[in-house]
């Protein structure tokens, strides 16, 4: 193995000055969350009078209930029932009475019905904020009256024509292709066209899009400059990546692109994210990516300008949903719940729900319990704009209103595009088996683009000849692209932008020098507990945390887990990298060990010492305590980590057992993203683990599941290299943990890291390290073996363990007087499997005849099933098992049983 230098000078980093201030100021909120502007107070502009009270009630009734009578269904299947509250008579009003001049109450009612019950409707009266309601009512009413210009109508018509033609082209050239086309929902491209144009006009610099399969290929080729030839290559079975790339690829409907949109009033960079087939899973990923982009740009919550900056400046997140998944998937609720949370807010996401009124074969009547698929938005007081998909021009208006609302209030806004699906879930599926009535209507009607273009022709905006000419030209372009398939090679789009200079991990194992000068570590350690003079610190923290750490820095002895972490964070910051740690209790730590943020006991103000190590510190630690969610949070953090490699992103579970609430994210992003999409991530998961008698859900991070997800070879031919899909480590000392964290940012490649984290080791003296174990020339040890007072040739038995179990095994061995004949080897890195390190250890014990794998976990859990074949195949060692018997869950909750099991594990180990 080659020892490599981290490169760069931390000393130089300390002296670097930042052009702009960007550090935490006491009393102004923590880094990553700007204080909210003061709420505006509105004076009463005049109350109701006896003369107008009932009319106002009628107006507000249309604003509140008008959407229930709106003309939203392009198929005409939805029965619109009369809403009693919209009848003027119940307010004691007569249609004949005059409102003003010749304007009668009948005229008022008709006007209200035209505005609030047409092909565009809105829900907003559930919002508590008076200013928002007033703004929406005024702007919506103006929006409905707006007329689009000729060039805007023609742009929409041309775009939808091309989208429809693209679907027809694919169906002709590739009749067995599942393309998940946009037919029936072509109005969604009026949304995207206006979104890009409007965002550029509002000085948005970056748009991050999360979208599933429906209409994705159309969006890529017709609006996002994705070369159709590359799509045709994929359809023909060719790889989307160069042969040199270490990747397996993904399905056609998960292709991605990014491009620069050049609008009439400005430009905006648009990025579509890769996604799995697990619908809505991309939502939090896109949110995390968007927020991370704001940090990289020093915008929004990360801006040094606290006076004028607002969350959402320069970066816009856009999520496109399907009606069935939007209603049914729990990650939707979790993600929206994050939308205004500190350290997660984006300043408003624009949501488009492509509501084709059916999910696979489930129609809306069985697909949800609510009136509309977007009703979830009302729980968070977000407005919903409903639009009939047969009216693309109304979609443009709705998009303008949504962008304006988001710009003004920096909150999420939803557009419910009610449309239909021309074919089945895919084009090879027959939907008439289960939805015959719906599909009679679908088959009997013209397409959305055709209806819209007929209107444009009828109104004199274009001619049928011009439409045919445009159609022919577009078909020729697609045919020309198809002809180039055999002569076109794929383009490597990985490691660009902020990832420039990074690469895929090598196939060999590397060892990097992750040590740091000890005088600097003492400086960081002391700085990590430094508080302002007027800060009212909790009395117990002085002795347990501050004084204790200062003593450790003076003696260089007994450095515990939290101190090692603080030194790792501080050194990473001073080397020019940012750090973000999120989780439900990460500021303090579930086990009250971290205290990265301290709370003033008099004012509740928060102080993060690591953000003030040096004056005008360039890089920052964001401590993100979050809501009780796993899937959305882990997805958010994965998206965050994929945006910038010079940022250590960590998610810590409250207990390791709770990770499986995020299993979809782990399976489809964390473990597989690089292989599928060449998307790298250095996300680190800290999963507290250990059998201490706490019972199920508080004992195991199920390391076996992560090991099963690793692409490590059982036969170890070749042996594992750095190119495994993720690293799984079970460190036993604070220094080991320190080196693990630093290794996540030192190399020029990134891999996810799963840390089987400790609980009792956090403060255990045997897990503590000396300052020299962190110094220059030190690195992570994949395997830790013992130094023996007598000859290692006398060793007859070798016990392999992983994690804190070694303390129990060592104690039992020494009590049995077996120290001279039994060796204990700690396997600290499970994946990549450390074959070379273990070979070196085994050579130390030529007389050993008995090899045991001892673990706390049941036989069907822990590392056993992973290490056993690798020991046999790569090392020629047949291991005996010592551990708990197979169990249907992780651990017993009966104290007596736990104690008895623990004794039995030790007895097996030394049998």
From Swiss-Prot:
| Keywords per UniProt | Glycolysis, Mitochondrion, Oxidoreductase, Thiamine pyrophosphate, Transit peptide
Q: Name one GO molecular function term.
A: 2-oxoadipate dehydrogenase activity
Q: Where in the cell is it found?
A: Mitochondrion
E.C. numbers: 1.2.4.-
Name the Gene Ontology biological process terms: glycolytic process
Is this entry keyworded DNA-binding?
A: no
Going by the entry's taxonomy, the superkingdom of the source organism is recorded as Eukaryota
Q: Which cofactor does it need?
A: thiamine diphosphate
The UniProt entry's GO CC annotations, sorted and at most eight, read: mitochondrion
Matching Pfam families, A to Z? E1_dh, OxoGdeHyase_C, Transket_pyr
* Keyword Iron-sulfur on entry: no
- InterPro entries cross-referenced by the UniProt entry: 2oxoglutarate_DH_E1, DH_E1, KGD_C_sf, ODO-1/KGD_C, THDP-binding, Transketolase-like_Pyr-bd
Specify where it is mainly localized: mitochondrion
Q: Which reaction does it catalyse?
A: N(6)-[(R)-lipoyl]-L-lysyl-[protein] + 2-oxoadipate + H(+) = N(6)-[(R)-S(8)-glutaryldihydrolipoyl]-L-lysyl-[protein] + CO2
Cystine pairs annotated here are none
Q: Which family does it belong to?
A: Belongs to the alpha-ketoglutarate dehydrogenase family.
Q: What does this protein do?
A: 2-oxoadipate dehydrogenase (E1a) component of the 2-oxoadipate dehydrogenase complex (OADHC). Participates in the first step, rate limiting for the overall conversion of 2-oxoadipate (alpha-ketoadipate) to glutaryl-CoA and CO(2) catalyzed by the whole OADHC. Catalyzes the irreversible decarboxylation of 2-oxoadipate via the thiamine diphosphate (ThDP) cofactor and subsequent transfer of the decarboxylated acyl intermediate on an oxidized dihydrolipoyl group that is covalently amidated to the E2 enzyme (dihydrolipoyllysine-residue succinyltransferase or DLST).
Q: What is this protein called?
A: Probable 2-oxoadipate dehydrogenase complex component E1 homolog
Species of provenance:
Caenorhabditis elegans
């Amino acid at each position: 193995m080659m020892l490599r230098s981290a490169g760069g000078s931390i000393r130089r980093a300390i002296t670097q000055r930042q052009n702009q201030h960007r550090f935490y100021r006491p009393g102004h909120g923590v880094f990553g969350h700007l204080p909210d502007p003061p709420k505006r107070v509105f004076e009463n502009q005049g109350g109701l009078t006896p003369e107008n009270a009932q009319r106002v009630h009628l107006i507000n009734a249309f604003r509140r209930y008008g959407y229930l009578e709106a003309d939203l269904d392009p198929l005409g299947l939805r029965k619109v029932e009369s809403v009693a509250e919209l009848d003027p008579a119940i307010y004691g009003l007569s249609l004949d009475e005059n409102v003003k001049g010749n304007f009668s109450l009948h005229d008022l009612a008709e006007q209200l019905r035209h505005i609030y019950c047409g092909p565009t409707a809105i829900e907003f009266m559930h919002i508590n904020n008076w200013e928002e309601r007033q703004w929406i009512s005024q702007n919506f009413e103006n929006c409905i009256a707006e007329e689009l210009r000729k060039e805007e109508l023609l742009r929409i018509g041309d775009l939808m024509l091309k989208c429809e033609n693209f679907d027809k082209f694919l169906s002709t050239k590739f009749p067995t292709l599942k393309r998940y086309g946009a037919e029936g929902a072509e109005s969604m491209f009026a949304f995207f066209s206006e979104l890009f144009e409007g965002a550029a006009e509002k000085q948005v610099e970056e748009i991050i899009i999360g979208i599933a399969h429906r209409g994705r290929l159309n969006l890529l080729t017709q609006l996002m400059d994705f070369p159709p030839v590359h799509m045709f290559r994929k359809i023909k079975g060719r790889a989307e990546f160069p042969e040199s790339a270490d990747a397996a690829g993904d399905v056609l409907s998960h292709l991605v692109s990014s491009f620069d949109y050049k609008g009439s009033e400005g430009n905006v960079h648009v990025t579509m994210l890769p996604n799995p087939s697990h619908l809505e899973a991309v939502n939090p990923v896109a949110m995390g990516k968007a927020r991370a982009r704001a940090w990289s740009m020093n915008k929004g919550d990360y801006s040094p300008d606290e006076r004028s900056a607002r969350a959402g400046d320069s970066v816009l997140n856009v999520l496109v949903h399907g009606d069935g998944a939007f209603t049914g998937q729990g990650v939707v609720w979790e993600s929206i719940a994050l939308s205004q949370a500190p350290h997660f807010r984006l300043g408003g996401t624009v949501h488009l729900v492509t509501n084709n009124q059916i999910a696979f074969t489930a129609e809306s009547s069985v697909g949800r319990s609510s009136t509309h698929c977007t009703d979830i938005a009302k729980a968070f007081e977000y407005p919903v704009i409903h639009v009939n998909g047969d009216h693309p021009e109304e979609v443009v208006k709705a998009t303008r209103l949504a962008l304006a609302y988001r710009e003004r209030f920096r909150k999420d806004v939803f557009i419910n595009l009610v449309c239909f699906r021309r074919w089945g879930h895919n084009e090879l599926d027959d939907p008439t088996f289960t939805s015959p009535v719906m599909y009679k209507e679908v088959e009997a009607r013209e397409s959305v683009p055709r209806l819209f273009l007929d209107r444009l022709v009828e109104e004199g905006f274009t001619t049928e000849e011009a439409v045919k000419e445009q159609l022919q030209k577009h078909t020729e372009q697609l045919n020309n692209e198809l002809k180039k398939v055999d002569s076109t090679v794929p383009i490597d789009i990985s490691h660009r932008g902020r990832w420039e200079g990074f690469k895929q991990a090598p196939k060999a194992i590397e060892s990097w020098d992750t040590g740091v000068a000890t005088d600097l570590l003492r400086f960081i350690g002391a700085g990590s507990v430094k508080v302002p003079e007027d800060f009212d610190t909790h009395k117990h923290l002085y002795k347990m945390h501050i004084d204790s750490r200062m003593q450790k820095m003076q003696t260089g002895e007994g450095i515990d887990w939290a101190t090692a972490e603080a030194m790792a964070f501080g050194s990473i910051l001073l080397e020019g990298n940012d750090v973000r740690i999120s989780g439900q209790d990460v500021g303090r730590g579930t086990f009250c060990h971290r205290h990265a943020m301290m709370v003033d006991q008099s004012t509740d103000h928060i102080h993060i010492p690591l953000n003030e190590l040096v004056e005008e510190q360039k890089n920052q630690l964001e401590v993100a305590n979050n809501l009780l969610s796993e899937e959305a949070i882990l997805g958010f953090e994965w998206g965050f980590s994929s945006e910038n490699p010079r940022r250590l992103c960590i998610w810590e579970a409250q207990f390791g057992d709770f990770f499986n609430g995020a299993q979809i994210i782990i399976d489809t992003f964390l473990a597989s993203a690089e292989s599928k999409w060449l998307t790298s991530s250095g996300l680190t998961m800290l999963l507290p683990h250990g059998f201490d008698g706490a019972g199920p859900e508080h004992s195991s991070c199920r390391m076996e599941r992560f090991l099963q997800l690793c692409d490590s070879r059982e036969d170890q031919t070749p042996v594992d290299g750095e190119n495994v899909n993720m690293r799984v480590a079970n460190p036993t000392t604070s220094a080991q943990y320190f080196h693990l964290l630093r290794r996540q940012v030192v190399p020029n490649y990134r891999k996810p890291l799963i840390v089987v984290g400790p609980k009792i080791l956090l403060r255990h003296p045997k897990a503590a390290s000396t300052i020299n174990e962190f110094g220059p020339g030190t690195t992570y040890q994949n395997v830790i073996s013992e130094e023996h007072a007598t000859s290692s040739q006398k060793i007859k038995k070798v016990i392999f363990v992983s994690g804190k179990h070694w303390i129990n095994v060592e104690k039992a061995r020494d009590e049995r007087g077996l120290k001279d004949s039994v060796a204990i080897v700690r396997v600290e890195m499970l994946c990549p499997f450390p074959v070379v390190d273990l070979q070196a250890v085994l050579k130390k014990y030529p007389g050993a005849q008995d090899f045991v794998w001892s673990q706390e976990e049941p036989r069907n859990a822990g590392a056993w099933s992973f290490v056993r074949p690798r020991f046999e195949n790569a090392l020629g060692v047949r291991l005996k098992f010592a551990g708990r018997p197979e169990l249907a869950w992780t651990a017993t909750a009966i104290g007596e049983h736990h104690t008895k099991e623990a004794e039995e594990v030790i007895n097996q180990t030394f049998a």
